[in-house]
Amino acid sequence: MFRLARAQTALANKASVSRSFLRLNSSFAIPETQKGVIFYENGGKLEYKDLPVPKPKANEILINVKYSGVCHTDLHAWKGDWPLPVKLPLVGGHEGAGIVVAKGENVKNFEIGDYAGIKWLNGSCMSCELCEQGYESNCLQADLSGYTHDGSFQQYATADAVQAAQIPKGTDLAEIAPILCAGVTVYKALKTADLKPGQWVAISGAAGGLGSLAVQYAKAMGLRVLGIDGGDGKEELFKQCGGEVFIDFRKSKDMVADIQEATNGGPHGVINVSVSEAAISMSTEYVRPTGVVVLVGLPADAYVKSEVFSHVVKSISIKGSYVGNRADTREATDFFTRGLVKSPIKIIGLSELPEAYELMEQGKILGRFVVDTYK
């Protein structure tokens, strides 16, 4: 009697598991728990601990995240100093690269075993005017990885299959991780500047995680690149990335004059990836007449100030550029896979994330930190 009951229970459990994995279309053994970093309040302790493995919805894929880039946005999400509130508790991270291990029943564009990337934009409505025009990141219903949706600072994370990045097999997952946000973001910013080969572009914050990639994308687009930054090793990294002229803001006595002299009248475009409010406003002074200033970095509570008379007489433009859409992602990834862009990364363990945030706050990071989720 009891033996029969146990057999029936075991059969029912097996059927339940089979249905579950069939529903998820998974052929991988997926654990119930995983390691991740989570915080329960803004500015609170970053806890490296066991977390439940999420289950993908019908439109989602489950990615076994191998590596994730560490972005300034992750720092803002933890601090909670942006006007957009984060979900709490939260697992941060939005530059995750890994392998698809499960998918919902409605997913058609990914197969189990494919390489996939988690981006800042996790999902959008795909039916509003903005989404129809390719501005998915501006959708009022946008779901953001590592901000409103648990992100890639964990070993398993979900992503909307429509927005997830498709990564070619054989790609170095550690090196492509920063491309999924930093790379796409600066690539889109350079497209927004709409410059022509041979023209000058200034990258403000040229040796950081975004800036070091912006220098390379700009060079690959045929632009002449002036970099602005300050700190040990930053000029060397800038030159390694292909930059032409470096201005150290710590040493320059007249930034505007030095930049305009180096570029024969000022750069045709400026990409502001720095989080310095003063540097952003200064870019409106040194950009050449008819030039364009592109805002990318997001310092909390900051304003860009442009003196109206000069703004009008010089006929300059100020534009905001906010990440990129699916086409931008595909194009930015293609630059990387063809070897035109390389990620200057330092790999650390996921458990070391708090130390990475501390160095980021101090402005001591060259290139990009990438976390190994299994360390």
Swiss-Prot record:
SMART domains: PKS_ER (SM00829). Residues 1-27 form a transit peptide. GO terms for molecular function: alcohol dehydrogenase (NAD+) activity; zinc ion binding. Binds 2 Zn(2+) ions per subunit. InterPro entries: ADH-like_C, ADH-like_N, ADH_Zn_CS, GroES-like_sf, NAD(P)-bd_dom_sf, PKS_ER. Keywords: Metal-binding, Mitochondrion, NAD, Oxidoreductase, Transit peptide, Zinc. Its EC number is 1.1.1.1. Disulfide bonds: none annotated. One of its GO terms (cellular component) is mitochondrial matrix. Its main location: mitochondrion. Zn(2+) 1 binds at C71, H94, C181. It catalyses: a primary alcohol + NAD(+) = an aldehyde + NADH + H(+); a secondary alcohol + NAD(+) = a ketone + NADH + H(+). It is found in: Mitochondrion matrix. NAD(+) binds at G205, A206, A207, G208, G209, L210, G211, D229, K234, V296, G297, L298, R368. Its cofactor is Zn(2+). Pfam families: ADH_N, ADH_zinc_N. Zn(2+) 2 binds at C125, C128, C131, C139. Belongs to the zinc-containing alcohol dehydrogenase family. Homotetramer. This is Alcohol dehydrogenase 4, mitochondrial. The lineage of its organism: Eukaryota, Fungi, Dikarya, Ascomycota, Saccharomycotina. The gene is ADH4.
